[in-house]
Amino acid sequence: NKAADAVALFDVVETLDREKLARALAEAAMKRGRSPRVLVQVNTGAEPQKAGVRSDQADDLIATARLTYGLTVEGLMCIPPAGQDPEPHFKTLSALADRNGLAVLSMGMSGDYETAIRCGATHVRVGTALFGERNRP
């Protein structure tokens, strides 16, 4: 089971996006005697092709993960819709974090990391800026 593997291998799980996964992580953590910190993945653009809890349901998932399953929710992460101004999405994530007392905001990639930092990002993903474009077959 992937949740059990994640608990065994990782200190942080960055993609908690539904209650079913929170339950699986909590059960695996109990069996292993160790619990990774988690970031809740928020689908700020409500894009059907992307994973992540909707912004309007994030508070409930955070509370459930903490109170029902005893998970350490450390922060939030998002990837804004391609072709849209990322700033409103980053501000939405920042407001969710403030409301829930979360310190970690993983948002922003090579093309928008400066905006993400202005909006409070603590983690940015800048692989393309560091290593260049991927060669895709």
Map each language-model feature to its residues.
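Active-site loop ensemble at the mouth of alpha/beta enzyme cores that anchors a bound cofactor
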Residues: 123, 136-137
